[in-house]
Amino acid sequence: MLARQFVRILAPVSDPHELLQAGRFEELANEEHPLWRGLALLELGRFADAAAVFEEAEGAQESGTMLELAGAARWLAGERQVAAERWIAALDAGHDGPAGAVKAPALLLYAGLRIPDERYLLRGKRLLGKLWKPKLARVWPGPVAGFLLGEVEEQPFLEDGYEDPDLEARRLSGAHFWAGVKEQDPEKARAHFQESAAIEGASALEVEHHLAKGELRGGQLR
């Protein structure tokens, strides 16, 4: 069982969190906080609008989370190079501890695979290599680095989770996305993306949940 820690995007706020859990995205899109509003717009398929919300939020350029989400929104809007630029910017932005710093280089590696662009792929892999230490596997999303580098096996990567249902929804959605990215067999990859996209509720807080839906819409499989 993973240590009861998690790199939190935002401590749950009762009303928006309840709207998110209930899938009431039209209402959530009217929330004042840009994180909740942007997530709702992502769920509603209004990707360009979501990107603008994340990018224009106060302090967005210093927030790894906002830049990662902005990149996902740009990616889903078909602006892949702009998305990669947002993820590159996220490399130097603020993160919650060493585990939180894993996501931006992982997303850059993903961009390198899908665009494809070997520069992004190699840079993402190199940065993950610098970050990876076995103890990082105790706090999500730390295990993502080890998994993408071949240091963590798929079964424990998918199965070693949290008791808290919200944390586990977020972790499992992310884990299935990265398993799909790494999987060589297109049908198995698609199954992982389906698992990631199907998890509801708190999973919407995770970039990977939205990118998995994009994979299914676009059939962007190797």
Language model features: what each stretch is:
Residues H17, L39, A72, L109-L113, ...:
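Residue-level recognition of tetratricopeptide repeat
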Residues L10-E27, H33-L41, A175-K182:
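Alpha-helical segment of the N-proximal tetratricopeptide repeat
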Residues E26-N30, D49-A57, V82-L91, E118-W132, ...:
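Alpha-helical repeat scaffolds
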Residues W36, E62, G100-V102, L107, ...:
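Structural signature of alpha-solenoid helical repeat junctions
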Residues L35-E43, G129-E168:
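Alpha-helical adaptor scaffolds
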Residues A22, L44, A77, I115-E118, ...:
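Structural motif corresponding to the intra-repeat A-B loop/turn of tetratricopeptide repeats
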Residues E32, Q61, G94, L131-K135, ...:
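Alpha-helical junction/boundary sensor with strong preference for TPR arrays
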